[in-house]
UniProtKB/Swiss-Prot annotation:
Localization per record: Secreted
Gene Ontology biological-process annotations: cytolysis in another organism
Family per similarity comment: Belongs to the aerolysin family.
Record GO terms (molecular function): toxin activity
Descriptive protein name: Leucotoxin LukE
Any Pfam family matching the protein: Leukocidin
Keyword Signal: yes
Subunit structure: Toxicity requires sequential binding and synergistic association of a class S and a class F component which form heterooligomeric complexes. LukE (class S) associates with LukD (class F). LukE can also associate with HlgB.
Signal peptide coordinates: 1-28
Gene3D superfamilies hit by this protein: Leukocidin/porin MspA (2.70.240.10)
Amino acid sequence: MFKKKMLAASLSVGLIAPLASPIQESRANTNIENIGDGAEVIKRTEDVSSKKWGVTQNVQFDFVKDKKYNKDALIVKMQGFINSRTSFSDVKGRGYELTKRLIWPFQYNIGLTTKDPNVSLINSITLPKTKIETTDVGQTLGYNIGGNFQSAPSIGGNGSFNYSKTISYTQKSYVSEVDKQNSKSVKWGVKANKFVTPDGKKFAHDRYLFVQSPNGPTGSAREYFAPDNQLPPLVQSGFNPSFITTLSHEKGSKLIRVNLKFSYGRNLDITYATLFPRTGIYAERKHNAFVNRNFVVRYKVNWKTHEIKVKGHN
């Protein structure tokens, strides 16, 4: 009965509802880097922020112009910030006076999609491309004249490449993996994994994760859950993504414009904690209570002029 009440109560949650606000956009000047043998990389950067979704997309577009490569290539680095939107609150309603609620990010989502027939993702050139559980993530993409791409961990450094680009981010207590990948899209999930707590290690699906007994029945919602110094950064504040993928385009194609869709966001869990004076604290959990709370931005890319335009967002 208690579980059914908690799940029903979740339907009335308004704390994670986005706040209405326009996006903010900024554009960096074009930078051209000569990489040898007449080849060059034309670099553009777009920043788009949304208070509504608590997300900043910083996307770097690096066009590879190489006469010895039979295709045009675009290296895309997706970085920025995704706010955790973690919150602590009372559960309203008669009988819930001693029940508190924690909303927190079980998973962060980062993705790129295109439906254009003249563009394909190079699946082997995706960072990261395998499951990674380490706290610190750092990998490198290397390019040599003629269309030779390589990526870590198969390479040992940057010195032997005409051009290279790196990713670096921290994911304490989380794990990164590719959820979906094909010639038209790639999606990463940075998911809750293992946590070190004062009571020992706990797995992400443990319903007592982050739950603690308050000092008394009059305690605030915040007192029912672990203090800030016991919460990993991805729960307490948010996540700074850093991911790379590469797209190819047929040289000479009359279709010089392509639509790309970038998605940054989170899936949120709800943890309920109820204090029973005689028996102590009791926890309930709703996994994926709110999924795909994503900020989606649509870009138009011109392969000929290397112009990037923001066409819209959700």
